[in-house]
Amino acid sequence: MKQLTLAKTVKGVGIGLHKGEPIEITLEPLEANSGIVFFRSDLNASYKASPENVINTQMATVLGDDRGFISTIEHLMSAINAYGIDNVRIVLNANEAPVMDGSSISFCMMLDEAEVKELDAPKKIMVIKKPVEVRDGNKFVRLTPTKEPRINYTIKFDNAVIGEQSYNFEFSKKNYIENIARARTFGFLKDVQALRSMNLALGGSLENTIVVDENRILNPEGLRFKDEFVRHKILDAIGDLTLLGYRVFGDYISYAGSHHLNHLLTKEVLKDKDAYEIVSLEKTTQKAYEKVFA
């Protein structure tokens, strides 16, 4: 099984969730073993997608350094993971990725347009060898060894509309596109004023966010899935784990997880060299793992 990049460059435009300004995005092919690289064209600054370059996880996953930052990368990273793309350059002319419709389906469409290209190098994956867990009170995220990677996610909100939701996701591109990619980000009406006073969520609207009041959803079209909230959390988690630099072959289990806990989990994994193994998918080893990339 070979590493993948894009067959051609594709461009798109969307609104930034937090600043509310138009953003141009370009996805470009990269050579083997380059990984996922973000480039701020307005700053002439590159940022490798990796846990060590994460500087904030409050409202989104943010890469950066003293030159600047790039926010809200998780939806795009999630789509890149689902398509099995190992090497890609993401060019942005602003400090965040566009929110599109609040899900990752627009990025999936861009990747469909770009198509994928095999490179002359074996694909590598990260195989989890022993359990790794991060906790914050009763909230936790955990990676454990497995023969068939799954995500088991539970959320619990003190809100009648959301309440407690659980979802089990088994990795495959087809499953992702059908059941995860269209799940939108969500927020609460009561938080909007406070966020905007901090210059956040200025681009948020019913076009790109599920807005929840105390006992109703304000979006006139309603939900895309009855459990869209937990499905979006899975979308986010896939994007956050992609910062490890490889498709992760392990069970991810979360109760009330977050970008912050996901970030701590990726750091915890990398801290313990016995917790994982990087496996090169040569012909002799790929059969056990190829289902994940179907």
Swiss-Prot record:
Domain of life: Bacteria
Keyword DNA-binding: no
Amino acids binding Zn(2+): 75, 232, 236
One GO cellular component term: membrane
GO molecular function: metal ion binding; UDP-3-O-acyl-N-acetylglucosamine deacetylase activity
Pathway annotation: Glycolipid biosynthesis; lipid IV(A) biosynthesis; lipid IV(A) from (3R)-3-hydroxytetradecanoyl-[acyl-carrier-protein] and UDP-N-acetyl-alpha-D-glucosamine: step 2/6
InterPro entries attached to this UniProt entry: Ribosomal_Su5_D2-typ_SF, UDP-acyl_GlcNac_deAcase, UDP-acyl_GlcNac_deAcase_C, UDP-acyl_N-AcGlcN_deAcase_N
Biological process per Gene Ontology, one example term: lipid A biosynthetic process
Enzyme Commission number: 3.5.1.108
Lipid biosynthesis keyword on record: yes
Protein keywords: Hydrolase, Lipid A biosynthesis, Lipid biosynthesis, Lipid metabolism, Metal-binding, Zinc
Entry annotation: catalytic residues: 259
Catalysed reactions listed for this entry: a UDP-3-O-[(3R)-3-hydroxyacyl]-N-acetyl-alpha-D-glucosamine + H2O = a UDP-3-O-[(3R)-3-hydroxyacyl]-alpha-D-glucosamine + acetate
Entry cofactors: Zn(2+)
Chain's role: Catalyzes the hydrolysis of UDP-3-O-myristoyl-N-acetylglucosamine to form UDP-3-O-myristoylglucosamine and acetate, the committed step in lipid A biosynthesis.
Family assignment from sequence similarity: Belongs to the LpxC family.
Protein name according to UniProt: UDP-3-O-acyl-N-acetylglucosamine deacetylase
